[in-house]
Amino acid sequence: MMADFQSIPLRPAAPVSHESLLQFPEDPVECMRQLHRRHGDIAVMEQESQRLAFVFSPELNRQVLTDSNSFHSRFFAVRGSRKSAQRRVTSGLLSQNGAEHRDTRRILKDVFSKKVLPGYHPTICRLTEDLLKDWHPGSERDLNVEMVQFMLRMTSALLFGLDDAGFAHELGHMIDRWVHQNHEVGMGALVSGPQFNSKYDELLEMADELENSIQTLFHKHRNQQHEMPNVLSLLFHAQASSQQLSDEKLTGHATLLFAAAHLTTAHTFSWTLFLLAQHPEIMQRVSGEVAEHVHGERPTIEELDRLEFLEHVIKESMRVLPASAYSQRIVAEPVTLNGIRLSPGTPVVFSQYITHHRPDLFESPDEFQPDRWKTISPSPYEYLPFGAGPRMCIGAPLAMAEIKTALALILKRCRLQMTANATVNGQVISTMLGPTSPIRAKVIPAGEETHTVPVHGSIHDLVRLPIEAMPQQQRRAA
């Protein structure tokens, strides 16, 4: 059962902990909780000559996320040699810094602007309807597996198009495997150890294969007329008016945009549907809102804009179980944070999860309470599911459109209830907080009541569920 976060003292001790840095990748959330409890807003872990710095307050989040001269981004820690495919496929927007990043973001901003979102709406609806074809009343679904596969199809279609859906889906699957391999070896760039180095050669081979497949896609895709709008077509259009967008750079952009979008959005779907299943009264309210405002089989853009409570549900899900639990910057020049001097090369971790669970920022922070969004308006550095500052996720509007549209379609047709004796585990892997077990739920017709069904698992260490949702032994402990 999760510790009472509100009882954690925030008065800092000396901010440096001399202990194994491997504690962080083994259990990032618990490690950060302990550091925050012990040291307050800033902490440093030291082991021999290695250091990891952590910031846990909105003000320090702001300093790290706005000072792009002192703190550089490195989306993937393992870049490969300068002439390697690994270097090229990791050279997109998310790995750029300084003037290069500003120029690229300016070129790409129209690709993800709100004015293009209506063009993606039919694809989002179509793929969600495909998902729901097998969601018959009484059937049991594994929300974890289904949302990962759903977002693999969705991200592939929106980024690469539906004209050759099979190839786009396979390319998306290839990128997904490559992302996982990066995690396997990438932590060694932050925390040295032989276990992080053994798969490096395999990663380089995967990058070669991935680059070749992306170039094949470019060849197929360029100069075609496409059934539906997609990001790659818009990237080619931007390339035609900018000499800065070579095919090599587009390869990096396409790879990293997919990597950033796929699993984070899949986890947001899984957690939101799980939280609704565990809070039947909220499920009933949001389903009622959808039924009241969505009159056809598909929600229109105007109808989606009227779903205020659904928006609150999504915001609260991303607060209490943020798919991006933490991220990091690398110190680029000597800098001081809260009196702590940091040298170039030092990783600095900031945590959405810890910030979102601070009781001085959010009342009862470990509870899922969508109604809090009626009265609160947190700053961008207090609530940052998509990051903040000049590097805030460029695809945030598209991600929100996907989530809101798909959830409206799902809730229009059904509700969900957890199956008996389910175990739900969550863990941070490669900065992302996602399910590591099945999330087994039963499909209930839209008009019927649902009930809270107790679940087991480490989910209770991450979020405070209603007392009815706790197994009997945990109810007694509570």
Predicted regions and their residues:
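Cytochrome P450 substrate-recognition site 1
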Residues: 2-22, 30-119, 130, 147, ...
